[in-house]
Amino acid sequence: MVVMSADLDNHAALNNALTEGWVVEPPVYAMTDAGRRGRRVLQFILWREGRPRVMTVVDTPEIRAWIDDQRWPIATLR
């Protein structure tokens, strides 16, 4: 089962998940928010103990810089 999680205001939930041992599986997916067409979001596929989890956060310059620091590719979906 895939666990879906949304924290669209900031990336604190993503940082918490990483602290809890979740690992990002690149690429990170960039897309338009289905609920608010004018907003871009990033989806991260996380894994821990053989279980996937999808986290969605707002696309910000700070998040992009952090992704660049990790050297993760970004795939644009729509």
Q: Model-found features: residue ranges?
A:
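Terminus-proximal functional modules
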Residues: 1-78
